[in-house]
UniProtKB/Swiss-Prot annotation:
Name recorded for this polypeptide: Small ribosomal subunit protein uS4c
Single GO BP term: translation
Organism of this sequence: Cypella sp. (strain Porto Alegre 027)
Primary residence: plastid
Signal peptide positions on this chain: none
Reported function: One of the primary rRNA binding proteins, it binds directly to 16S rRNA where it nucleates assembly of the body of the 30S subunit.
Length: 194
């Protein structure tokens, strides 16, 4: 994990740790000139590691984004941001995306009153995300909400920490994506692969 954040920069979805300010400068001096391929590859890896996806999963999302209307890069980010595990992370119900994925896999999360155990479940506007009524589930979420840094919540989400309930208001706008990334480089990377 630390090698990844040292090489690619801050990845809030993977870990809350940040790279040291001097380490990035050393890497750039040591590596010399970066090729265009390397720049595109690093952007793709940043996206992959932040959202915790395999290469195959990311490729599937790129193909889905390519078929949809609109800018492929923007649609790709919207698809990734509307995943259930990412929404739990952005609501502050989990400290990292892998932590959110574990909550979903262990069946602690309900979407619109139904248990969902698929982390890649695509949330839609007006979805209500809650925890199970069991005490263990509520304690887990309560600990995460209490320890989460209360950064500004994106416009497309609302949380009620007392009821352990989150609401998806709308599809995310690209300016609220929690990662500094040039999504066009990711699309370029895959368009050159085929």
């Amino acid at each position: 994990r630390f090698k990844k954040i040292r090489r690619l920069g801050a990845l809030p979805g993977l870990t809350s740790k940040r790279p040291r300010s001097g380490s990035d400068l050393k890497n750039q001096l040591r590596s010399g000139k970066r090729s265009q391929y390397r720049i595109r590859l690093e952007e793709k890896q940043k996206l992959r590691f932040h959202y915790g996806l395999t290469e195959r999963q990311l490729l599937k999302y790129v193909h889905m984004a390519g078929k949809a209307k609109g800018s492929t890069g923007q649609v790709l980010l919207q698809l990734l941001e509307m995943r259930l595990d990412n929404i739990l992370f952005r609501l502050g119900m989990a400290s990292t995306i892998p932590g959110a994925r574990q909550l979903v896999n262990h069946r602690h999360i309900l979407v619109n009153g139904r248990i969902v155990d698929i982390p890649s479940y695509r949330c839609k506007p007006r979805d209500i995300i809650t925890t199970k009524d069991k005490e263990r589930s509520k304690v887990l979420i309560q600990n995460y909400i209490a320890s989460s840094s209360h950064e500004e919540l994106p416009n497309h989400l609302t949380i009620d920490p007392l009821q352990y309930k989150g609401l998806v208001n709308q599809i995310i706008d690209s300016k609220w994506v929690g990662l500094k990334i040039n999504e066009l480089l990711v699309v370029e990377y895959y368009s050159r692969q085929t």
